[in-house]
Amino acid sequence: MVDRALKSADIVGRVPSILGIRPGQTDEEGWAAIDEFVADTDDGRKRRKALEDCIDENAYHFHAHGVELGHRYTSTAVVGDGTPFPAHTRDPELYYQPTTHPGAYLPHVWIERNGEQISTLDAVGHGRFTVITGIGGEAWVAAAEKIGAEVGVEIASAPIGYRLAFDDVYGDWARAREISDGGCLLVRPDRHIAWRSHGMADDPLSALREAIDAVLSRV
């Protein structure tokens, strides 16, 4: 993030010099520089090309969605699932590649709640942990309620699927979630994914309790 910010500042900082604008110039000198910039001369053409190139590079300054949303990291508050992060298929700074891999930010998908359109991001956060599951995931919901009471931490549940409390009306969540209907995502209050199970565990209570204990450093 810091490296990208410094690079962006460098790109933006080139514009005045390309235009010929420098500290201490008089108004007349500044306008003369602009006149030369638009002139039918080799220098004018060279500077206009330099500005066009600089504008193209500014996509990294104004449209770096990958930098803004694609944070991926490991920590003691993230429990890996033994798989690597998905490889980026496009420029990781410019393009956001959604994933539910532990350590990633929960992907945005439009779903419905009580007939109103909301984002998956609205279903989580709000200062609490959230368990996301799907059709057949009732055991995860029960486990979250029991563990939350045990540890004194609120763990909300957000069942997402066709005709569930959070209705996946268009099936977009099913395409984005990277787990099965009976799988589970444990989402932290900051909307980063702390842990996931690709399918229903043999003992969902123990599996979720182990994840919660690890994330909260209770082990």
Language-model regions: role of each:
Residues M1-V219:
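Helical substrate-recognition/capping region of FAD-dependent monooxygenase/halogenase enzymes
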